[in-house]
Structures are given as structure tokens and as C-alpha cells.
């Protein structure tokens, strides 16, 4: 249910009115209060899942939700205070539940603590809201649900964009020019640790690789990999960064962040992806967070090694994907110590790079094709599973 209409569309709940809302909601979540359109509506349309939209000035249907899309969870904001009083009356009476939809993977325990405190301030039962999170730990929490948002997000960017099928790399049998692809647009210290070590050890000579200089305020003291355990690594890493940015394509900075833009040769001319995920430990939550970075490799016919949260491969298996366990060492995924997981992942990489890349790719081919087909398929069942969890 929504408070406002915009032509024939609902206007996102709690969002300030844009200068030209009749054109597009693009960029809505980029500024305070970081409210964004609820992506679920787009996904329901993409995959033909039934979704009834109504407004708070109409009769409230049974089991109705009031969706609030979050581009970023801001702990300084009292989200409940932003809800119109007439809508809040329905929530207080139990006729309507708030549904926070958050596609990011930061710590959901902290978000629950904040929202439960706000419930107490406003005299609301904690059962007045549900929270959808991109962090897998959400499934272990009361009133929280995990949803693989980025799988469906990249589907609508990589499979079918604005009603048109998108190009993608194929699992061809021809020799390829590079062993692997490893891309990083945004600088984070843990990513710099990994890529600089590849660089120092001469592992990038047969790779498509990049390391950008876009910064988001990441602090070296927050690096989840303990640099003190590697003599001289920090100084060599800083030297590596001073030579950047490093590029492997001709795309602009804007195109690098446009998920429907594909430099196809980075996948069709290399054998696998070493994925530098968005988060490495998901704010000590114990959960995993999988983004389009991983799904881009899957869609474009690449097997993968993932530098990311523990449990990332396990989550992919739970989603139905194959993680090439018969063809490379994937035991790193179960290691919770961030530094040890980094060491074990590097060991798996080095073992893989000793193999005949072409022969190894052919061994993986059936699983590559299986994963690609699974990703391209309808996500109706994903949405149905989410609806089922929210109805409990």
C-alpha cells in the first residue's frame, strides 16, 4: 500500500517529491533520507508474479504491507516518524504492516536493534514491521527475511533490459587469450590487499584485471585482513596504489557502474572470474552478501573463485547454483577467520593457475551451462518463497 500516486504509478513511501517525478525515479536514493523505490515491484513485473497495489485512502485489504525501500539504512533517521499519521493509525491498529526492503548486506542485527527501539518510542509492537535484507543472516532472525535481491537486479540488467534481450558471453570451445578476469571499480583496503598481492607475485600477466580509484571513505584500520601477518605487504600495497588506476577496457566511469553495459571480451576471452565481492565480512554479522559481481560471472559463462564473506558458496548452492567443487578447492568458503580465508583462497587460486586452463574449462562446462541457464530462468519461485516467508 502506498500513500501517494504519481500518474499511474505509486510514489515510493516516505520519499521526498522529486523535481520531475513524472519522468523517472532514477537517483532517488542518492540523497537524504536515502529512500528508494521498492525493487520488488519491478521484479514482480519482470517475472509475472501477482502483486496488488492499493492506496491508504482506500479500504485496507487483508495482510497488507506498507513498503519502504531503503537505498541505505541510516541509523540517525526515525523512519516511523516520517509515516503520515493517518497511515500510522492503520499500523497501530494492526491493519497494516511496515515492510522495509533493503538490498544491501550490512549487519541486520544492528538494524533490528534500532527499529525495535523506535517501536518502543512510538508505542508500536515489534510485530508491526518486517525487514527484507540482502544479508543471509536475516533468515535466522525473528521478523527478518533474506532475499537474493542482486540476482533479480542483475537479471533485469543483464538478461532483459527495457524489454530487450541483452548480449552475453557464451561457453565456447575456442582457446582464450587470458587465464582469468578480476575487476575492481571501487577502492577498498581489503581489495587492495588482494590485488596488490596478485600484482607483486606476478599472477596478473595473463589476466584481464583492473583496480579503480573510486573511493567511499574506506579506512585502512577497518581492513578485515590483518596486514601485520604479511611482512612488507602494506608498503608494497601503497606503492601499488600510487600507480593506479589500472584499466583493462575503454569504458567510462559511468559505464563501469551501469550494470547493463558489458565488455564481453573480458569474459569470452578468459577462462574464469576471480570475483572481488562488495563485502568481505558483512560487518561481523556472520552472514554472506552476494551481488551482481558474482552473478555477472555466472551469466557470462565463467566458473569462479570468490573473495567475499564466509558462506558465499554455500549460499549459492542453496540458491541452486553449482560451485565447481569437483574442479577446484572451495574449502576456503567455510573459513570464518578473514585473514585465514584470504590465505586459503589465494592457495586455491594458485592451485588453479597451475592447471591447463583450457582443459579445466572444458571439465567445468556442464556446470557452467547449468548455472547460466538457471540464472536466465524465471525468478517467479524466488518471489513466491519470499511471499511465503513474509506471510508466516
Ranges and model annotations:
Residues 1-275, 281-291, 295-392:
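Pol beta-like nucleotidyltransferase catalytic core
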